């Protein structure tokens, strides 16, 4: 069965066709711009739909093959949808701040994750031998780790594909992915460059409703990949098979 798709109607309803003011555009996005209206660039959704479908198929196939997806979106309106989508699909995310070397210096990051997990175990266990001040310090350290590493604590290595909201804001994350040869799927507004993006998706990257639509679509594609892998392995999925057969292609 094909991966979930996002329709033209859904994109228009979410305001995905609205780019930025024309004077803020990046000329490299010209091939994806339909025109301008009242000083605002209008993105060409007739390209967005097939490009989105292509990206979702790739994500689904990657997960089916045992790959991991890293959702990245640290701007305010993307933080919650990014985390929810990653959790719902059993994937991983960064939604607070991208730490330099998060992928290219994975060995150091892995050490920090070990410390994070050790803190969680310590605080969940018997803290009777610690002073209130010591418990507070450990709690603050754990909370700091939760913000920066909570979404990748169980990733276990670099991801196989990265999904990005706002390529400008997440420039460092994209550069690290490029260095490591990790394919990047990114929502590209009219003010960004498509350079370094393996799967460009021209669409508004600011509207909350649109961001949620993209995140849910990627989560659905990743979930489908996981289910297909389980079915292919001959796992007994019980009642899962019936809903799968009836699942609509549309998100």
UniProtKB/Swiss-Prot annotation:
Q: Ribonucleoprotein: present as a keyword of the record?
A: yes
Which GO cellular component terms are attached? cytosolic small ribosomal subunit
- Report which superkingdom the organism of origin falls in: Bacteria
InterPro entries xrefs: Ribosomal_uS2, Ribosomal_uS2_bac/mit/plastid, Ribosomal_uS2_CS, Ribosomal_uS2_flav_dom_sf
The record's Pfam families line, in alphabetical order, gives: Ribosomal_S2 (PF00318)
Which biological processes are named by the entry's GO terms? Answer: translation
By its UniProt entry, which CDD domains does this protein fall under? RPS2
Instruction: Tell me the leader sequence span.
Output: none
Q: Name one GO molecular function term.
A: structural constituent of ribosome
Question: Keyword Transmembrane helix on this protein?
Answer: no
Q: Which UniProt keywords apply?
A: Ribonucleoprotein, Ribosomal protein
Q: Which PROSITE patterns match?
A: RIBOSOMAL_S2_1, RIBOSOMAL_S2_2
Q: Which family does it belong to?
A: Belongs to the universal ribosomal protein uS2 family.
Q: What is this protein called?
A: Small ribosomal subunit protein uS2
């Amino acid at each position: 069965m094909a991966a979930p798709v996002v329709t033209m109607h859904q994109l228009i309803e979410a305001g995905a066709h609205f780019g930025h003011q024309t004077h803020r555009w990046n000329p490299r996005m010209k091939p994806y711009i339909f025109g301008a209206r009242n000083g605002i660039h209008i993105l060409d959704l007739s390209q967005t739909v097939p490009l989105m479908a292509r990206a979702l198929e790739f994500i689904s196939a990657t997960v089916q093959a045992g790959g991991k997806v890293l959702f990245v979106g640290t701007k305010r309106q993307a933080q919650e949808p990014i985390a929810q989508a990653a959790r719902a699909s059993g994937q991983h995310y960064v939604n607070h701040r991208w730490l330099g070397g998060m992928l290219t210096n994975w060995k150091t990051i892995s050490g920090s994750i070990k410390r994070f997990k050790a803190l969680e175990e310590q605080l969940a266990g018997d803290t009777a031998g610690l002073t209130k001040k010591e418990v507070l310090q450990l709690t603050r350290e754990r909370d700091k780790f939760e913000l920066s590493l909570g979404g990748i604590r169980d990733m276990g290595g670099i991801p196989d594909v990265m999904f990005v909201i706002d390529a400008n804001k997440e420039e460092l994350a994209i550069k690290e992915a490029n260095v490591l040869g990790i394919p990047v799927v990114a929502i590209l507004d009219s003010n960004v460059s498509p350079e370094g993006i393996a799967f460009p998706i021209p669409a508004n990257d600011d509207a909350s409703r649109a961001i949620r639509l993209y995140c849910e679509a990627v989560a659905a594609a990743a979930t489908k990949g996981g289910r297909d892998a389980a079915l292919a392995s001959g796992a007994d999925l019980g009642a899962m098979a019936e809903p799968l057969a009836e699942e609509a292609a549309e998100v």
